[in-house]
Amino acid sequence: MLVVIYTPALDVLLIERSDQPGFWQSVTGSKDFLDEPLADTAQREVLEETGFDCAQPGFILRDWHLSNRYEIYPVWQKRYCPGVTHNTEHVFSLRLPTALAPQLNPREHSAWLWLPYLQAADRCFSPSNAEALLLLPQFAVL
């Protein structure tokens, strides 16, 4: 799961991983159970990682109906079952009416910043995250 959080000005929220300083990303995560609907996963991960409730007035969650399959980085391989080497990432976005300060879980993320989407794409460590940010103008609800 990848959720790009942005404003109408196409400023994007990035959060820095606590376990990998310098690794900036959008909200990411996985289903809690096999049948969990993707939209529910996106909403839960946003709440867990930023404190933002997607149901707040003015917030717009959108499924891009786009997915990426990529090889799992070795540093995170231990989080997966033995033999699992690839992950399928479903892309969503969440438009906020304005840039807000997230409430980070310090076990997962240590810092946050808002950047224009092109600068944010350059800052992301994940190629699929950077690609999603570059697609933001096509998928954004303005």
Task: Identify the function of each model-found stretch.
Residues 26-64:
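The catalytic Nudix box helix
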Residues 1-13, 34:
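Conserved N-terminal beta-strand and adjoining loop/helix that marks the start
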Residues 5-8, 17, 94-96:
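Active-site beta-strand termini and strand-to-loop segments that position acidic
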Residues 65-101, 113:
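Active-site-adjacent beta-strand/loop module that shapes the phosphate/pyrophosphate-binding cleft
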Residues 15, 42, 46, 112:
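Hydrophobic pocket/interface hotspot
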Residues 135-142:
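C-terminal alpha-helix
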Residues 20-23:
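A conserved beta-turn-beta hairpin within the catalytic core of GNAT-like acetyltransferases
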